Design a protein with these regions (language model features):
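Class I SAM-dependent transferase core
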Residues: 16-103, 111, 119, 132-134, ...
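Conserved nucleotide-cofactor-binding alpha/beta core module
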Residues: 95-215
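Cysteine-centered motifs
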Residues: 7-10, 20
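Positively charged
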Residues: 232-238
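Compositionally biased, intrinsically disordered/low-complexity regions enriched for serine, proline
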Residues: 9-10, 161, 222-223
Length: 238
């Protein structure tokens, strides 16, 4: 009996690898054109990056067929990969620059980490689930990204040991934004967080203008899973 090796991505025989790659690239192109452009992501640098970084390689194997679908993908431990359009919009709004020092709260699969690393100078990414950090480290190394520090820990109040940051991204929602995050921003730094409680949440961009001056702009309404271990606001009981 002759054993036929299957491609990890499409499950076709490896002899069909070229066809598999063409199918993947078409699916990636369709994701960008149909989902992401239509969600007001028009920055060409971001769009080109989404066509370059292979999202399917960051998706758990059993969900790989959904790598380009407009939905959240379960990672386990009550965490998800955000929908592609949400990831892209967050990246665009932060206007990441090559000199930026970036804090990512919630590494997850490592895909957004990879996008940030391609655009920025240095990325510090903190994840509460150690196995996610270990898996992300392997994936990022496979993409040749060496400007990332991965930490296992609780960054629900930020990561002050390496502050200040030019960019801070929270990949899960918070009911209220802790002031500690704002204090970890450099002057001119930008922070993006989805604030509120389901079903009503808003993505905000916070900019630090000076030592004591901050501006906040509501960007769009959405709903994403919460950041874990975040202090909940006090509630009145009548």
């Amino acid at each position: 009996m002759t054993l036929i090796e299957l491609c990890d991505n499409c499950k076709l025989p490896k002899s069909s690898t070229l066809r598999c790659r063409m199918n993947l690239e078409q699916a990636r192109f369709n994701m960008v054109e149909s989902q992401i452009r239509t969600w007001e992501v028009l920055d060409q640098t971001v769009l080109d990056l989404l066509l370059t970084i292979r999202r399917e390689e960051f998706v758990p194997e059993k969900y790989r067929d959904l790598a380009f679908a407009d939905l959240e993908i379960p990672l386990g431990h009550a965490e998800v990969m955000l929908a592609p359009k949400m990831e892209a919009r967050m990246i665009q709004e932060l206007d990441v620059r090559k000199t930026d020092k970036i804090l990512e709260v919630g590494t997850g699969s490592g895909y957004v980490t990879a996008l940030l690393a391609k655009l920025g100078g240095q990325v510090i990414s903190v994840e509460r689930v150690p196995e996610f950090s270990h898996a992300a480290m392997r994936r990022l190394a496979g993409h040749g990204l060496q400007n990332v520090q991965l930490h296992s820990g609780n960054a629900a109040e930020g990561w002050p040991t390496q502050a200040p940051y030019d960019v801070i991204l929270l990949t899960g929602s918070v009911p209220l934004l802790s002031e500690s995050f704002q204090q970890q921003l450099a002057i001119g730094g930008r922070l993006l967080a989805v604030i509120g409680e389901s079903p009503v949440m808003t993505a905000y961009l916070v900019t630090r203008a000076s030592a004591n001056a901050f501006s906040s702009v509501g960007l769009f309404e959405t709903s994403i899973p919460p950041l874990r271990d975040v202090k909940q606001p006090e509630r009145f009981v009548f």
